[in-house]
Every structure is written in C-alpha cells, then in structure tokens.
C-alpha cells in the first residue's frame, strides 16, 4: 500500500510539473502573438468569419 501511495504521489508531482511547464509555454506564445499585429489580425479573422459566413449566406438566399 505504501508503494502505491508513493507511486501515485510521484505521478501527481510529475503531472503538476508538466502542466506548469505547458502553461508557461502557452503564456509565452500568447504574449508573442499579441506583439505581432499580423497574428492579431489573423485571430480576429478566425473569430469573425464563422459568425459572418451564415449571415451572408442567409442574405444571399443560399
């Protein structure tokens, strides 16, 4: 039972470290994207196009 608890604790610890590293990398990527105006424009397009496509299609009668 003690070895099982030890193993679970080790897995939890390693998973926490891995999650922390992933969050740091994601935050760094987001900061980098915010600095680049071209990337920001692409992000806005990705958010707007799915909304506008059905509206335009409805107006055109498709």
Swiss-Prot record:
Signal sequence, renumbered to the chain: 1-22
Modified residues (Leucine amide): 60
Keywords for this protein: Amidation, Amphibian defense peptide, Antibiotic, Antimicrobial, Cleavage on pair of basic residues, Cytolysis, Hemolysis, Secreted, Signal
Keyword match Secreted: yes
Residue ranges listed under propeptide: 23-45
Compartments (UniProt record): Secreted
Tissue specificity note: Expressed by the skin glands.
GO BP annotation list: defense response to Gram-negative bacterium; defense response to Gram-positive bacterium; hemolysis in another organism
GO cellular component terms attached to this protein's record: extracellular region
Main location: secreted
Role this protein plays: Antimicrobial peptide. Has low activity against the Gram-positive bacterium S.aureus (MIC>100 uM) and the Gram-negative bacterium E.coli (MIC>100 uM). Has weak hemolytic activity against human erythrocytes.
Family: Belongs to the frog skin active peptide (FSAP) family. Temporin subfamily.
Full protein name: Temporin-CDYb
Species assigned in the record: Rana dybowskii
